[in-house]
């Protein structure tokens, strides 16, 4: 990837296809369970907390946190996505707790007057030309004792998905970019590299989850055993924090605490 992806051209389609789907619902269920655990580890004496939702799209997760009484700075490269987020936040009666900033994550420090308590950085790195420095810059904005929540498109999940779909030559060719898939990231990140970047920035990893460890690999329903959507969610919740399933998730969510 030669430049960062801006979703101005497909913001409405992105919102519908990503957030308004079963896949999006599974993602929110798992990540919110993690965030509840994360928030319990933050200093609850400090209320409200200041959250940075970096590249936050429609701010689905940070709105859940805002409902608990906390303040959020939401930034995004896409002005169209920010407008959609503002409408959604206003509809939910949370606009007073938000500050919306039209900015890439790489320069968000210019809009912050002090370190934040928590950074959310979800499903952004796989769309960036240089994900490592972007992540490192955001980690630098967290106060000592603060937390970070990072979700990224998993390279191992991308390999496995292509293999089970029979796209074996594509995998053997190292999965070159295919322009026709606008809503699907074309490159995954290696989990071990992302973990290293976080730890090198002075953070201790507190937990990890695989997002959609099973649902994306299930084939044609006509040839499958019978189950309900609720069963699938229960399966994901049961195994998403256990290896080897965790490392086969289409996304991986990792959260960490900055050392004092």
Write out the residue ranges for each language-model feature.
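A conserved beta-strand element that flanks and buttresses the S-adenosyl-L-methionine
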Residues: 120
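Class I SAM-dependent methyltransferase SAM/SAH-binding core
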Residues: 60-107
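A C-terminal cap/extension of S-adenosyl-L-methionine-dependent methyltransferases
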Residues: 207-260
């Amino acid at each position: 990837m030669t430049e960062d992806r801006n979703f101005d051209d497909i913001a409405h389609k992105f919102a519908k296809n990503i957030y308004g789907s079963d896949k999006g619902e599974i993602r929110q269920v798992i990540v919110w369970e993690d965030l509840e655990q994360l928030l319990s580890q933050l200093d609850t004496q400090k209320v409200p907390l200041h959250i940075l939702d970096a590249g936050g799209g429609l701010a689905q997760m940070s709105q859940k946190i805002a409902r608990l009484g906390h303040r959020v700075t939401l930034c995004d490269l896409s002005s169209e996505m920010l407008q959609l987020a503002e409408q959604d936040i206003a509809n939910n009666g949370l606009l007073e707790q938000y500050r919306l900033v039209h900015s890439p994550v790489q320069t968000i420090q210019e809009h912050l007057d002090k370190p934040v308590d928590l950074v959310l950085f979800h499903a952004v790195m796989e769309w960036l030309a240089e994900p490592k420095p972007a992540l490192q810059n955001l980690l630098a904005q967290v106060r000592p004792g603060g937390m970070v929540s990072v979700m990224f498109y998993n390279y191992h999940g991308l390999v496995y998905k292509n293999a089970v779909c029979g796209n074996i030559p594509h995998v053997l060719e190292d999965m070159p970019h295919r322009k026709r898939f606008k809503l699907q990231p074309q490159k995954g990140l290696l989990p071990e590299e992302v973990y290293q970047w976080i730890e090198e920035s002075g953070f201790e990893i507190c937990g990890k989850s695989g997002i959609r460890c099973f649902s994306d690999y299930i084939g044609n329903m006509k040839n499958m055993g019978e189950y309900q959507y609720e069963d699938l969610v229960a399966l994901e919740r049961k195994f998403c924090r256990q290896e080897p399933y965790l490392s086969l998730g289409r996304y991986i969510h990792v959260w960490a605490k900055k050392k004092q």
